[in-house]
């Protein structure tokens, strides 16, 4: 619940961009993100999400956090955690007075409490309930291998949470490089793909960069996600295209705008061989790791 910085909205902001990228203040940006976050975690209705927004505003007000707050003076422990949010929701539900008029109903409050219980105080709270405790972030790696064994909504919510931390560094602080390996993990959450796409468009203004990596292009060409993923291939300045595997050559060429003669350079599996593109320039490269880097890789992960 610590408000993240999503960069400043400007005239170049895409009208189709996620809501946080179009808001002005840091708090309004983060509350807009949290609505998408809760929608990712549970399929809340619009009325439930609007209720969550009202309750979040009440929660931040209790902690003295407003649109004019100076976040440079704040420590992670100055912000609420998920259990604080659940306590507020439960309090609103328990003290609901049917004789008064509210913007939300008692039933909606009950549904919200049930929906966020596991995340805030239940079995899944260990992933979400706590203050940001990262102190040394000059080089940071989020290991998400264990997420593959969780349910889809928990995985999507956790990846979305990591994405908010990365966006804060890329667009808020700047001069940061974020590398997202195994990008296919995000494909079950199309909202996250939109966030990544919009961050990629804005990072250059903050002297930041985004690196995307994935092994199988097939995952990105599924009809239900193709509309969202195709822009991800056109935004990067540099492309390293390796052997694409067992895929329809035309699909690959259309998605990455590769000419047939360029595809011919990488259509066979040759370790380390790739087509490098930058603007109008094309190079056939042989990528080799020097001995000292090869040692860093260790013995895990294939040969």
At which residue positions do the language-model features occur?
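C-terminal amphipathic alpha-helical interaction region
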Residues: 215-218
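P-loop NTPase motor domains
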Residues: 1-208, 212, 265-269, 274-280
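C-terminal regions of RecA-like/P-loop NTPase motor modules
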Residues: 220-303
């Amino acid at each position: 619940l610590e408000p993240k910085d999503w960069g400043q909205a400007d005239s170049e902001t895409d009208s189709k961009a996620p809501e946080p990228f179009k808001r002005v203040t840091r708090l309004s940006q983060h509350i807009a993100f949290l609505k998408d976050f809760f929608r990712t975690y549970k399929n809340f209705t619009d009325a439930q999400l609007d209720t969550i927004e009202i309750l979040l505003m009440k929660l931040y007000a209790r902690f003295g956090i407003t649109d004019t707050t100076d976040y440079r003076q704040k420590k992670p422990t100055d912000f609420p955690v998920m259990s604080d949010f659940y306590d507020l929701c439960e309090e609103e539900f328990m003290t609901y007075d049917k004789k008064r008029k509210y913007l939300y109903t008692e039933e909606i409050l009950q549904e919200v409490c049930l929906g966020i219980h596991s995340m805030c105080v239940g079995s899944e709270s260990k992933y979400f309930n706590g203050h940001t405790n990262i102190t040394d972030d000059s080089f940071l790696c989020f290991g998400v291998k264990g997420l593959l064994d969780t349910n889809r909504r928990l995985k999507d919510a956790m990846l979305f949470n990591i994405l908010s931390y990365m966006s804060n560094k890329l667009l808020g602080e700047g001069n940061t490089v974020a590398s997202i390996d195994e990008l296919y993990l995000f494909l079950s959450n199309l909202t996250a793909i939109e966030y990544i796409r919009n961050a990629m468009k804005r990072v250059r203004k903050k002297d930041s960069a985004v690196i995307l990596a994935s092994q199988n292009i097939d995952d990105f060409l599924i009809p239900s996600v193709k509309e969202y993923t195709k822009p991800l291939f056109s935004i990067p300045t540099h492309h390293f295209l390796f052997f694409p595997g067992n895929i329809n050559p035309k699909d690959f060429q259309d998605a990455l705008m590769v000419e047939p003669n360029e595809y011919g350079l990488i259509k066979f599996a040759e370790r380390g061989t790739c087509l490098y593109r930058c603007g109008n320039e094309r190079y056939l490269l042989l990528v080799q790791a020097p001995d000292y880097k090869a040692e860093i890789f260790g013995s895990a992960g294939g040969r």
